[in-house]
A protein has these predicted regions:
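Short beta-strand segments
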Residues: 35-37, 90, 114, 148
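Cofactor-binding loop segments of dinucleotide-utilizing enzymes, especially the Rossmann-like FAD-
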Residues: 39, 64, 170
Length: 189
């Protein structure tokens, strides 16, 4: 108990210092910041975007599933360079206010909300809380947000931010709709 009483405040102070250093580094970088969140699909979308955008731009992406405060902080401190043009930031949450906090930290220019589902229902307590939390990215994005209209919970979501809202999907009408998609043993096209 004594060790915990001594170590917890120290750990919090160190975290704050690391995050402050990451915030300062991010503020000094002129890169486009893209936040990606959702109950599922975050890592896949981030990885696909990183592959595509890296063909033309210098990109930094959070590795693996580094999608919480300290994972994002570590990525910014250790991997982001001033020459990076795009920062792809996966943002995960299993409690209320975590996406909002990450958005205040990263200050994304663009957001992508992949899907809303029942993951982390035990900690969020309701589907409404999950939807509200994931949509915090749409509320904090500065320029535009991409919303998956194939997801029944996102399809009619109310977004109060006056930025451009761009829909995407395969099954439902959308601004960007995947068509003629074929999948077989050799892959997809």
């Amino acid at each position: 108990i004594v060790t915990a009483l001594l170590s917890v405040p120290l750990e919090k102070r160190i975290r704050r210092q690391y995050r402050q250093a990451a915030s300062e580094k991010l503020a000094g970088c002129s890169c486009i910041k893209i936040g990606i969140t959702g109950s599922y699909g975050k890592t896949s979308v981030k990885n696909i975007l990183n592959q595509l955008l890296s063909m033309k731009y210098a990109c930094c992406a959070t590795p693996l599933s580094y999608n919480n405060e300290m994972g994002i902080t570590r990525t910014i401190r250790e991997k982001l360079t001033l020459s990076d043009e795009i920062f792809l930031c996966e943002m995960g949450a299993d409690h209320v206010h975590e996406i909002e906090d990450l958005c205040r930290f990263v200050q994304p220019d663009y957001g992508i909300v992949t899907a809303v589902g029942l993951q982390h229902l035990a900690t969020f307590k309701s589907l409404e809380n999950i939807l509200h939390e994931k949509l915090q990215l749409a509320e904090y994005a500065k320029k535009a947000v991409f919303i998956n209209t194939d997801n029944e919970y996102l399809r009619n979501a109310q977004i109060n931010n006056p930025i451009k809202i761009i829909s995407y999907g395969v099954k439902q009408p959308a601004d960007y709709q995947g068509v003629n998609i074929f999948c077989d043993a050799s892959g997809s096209r």
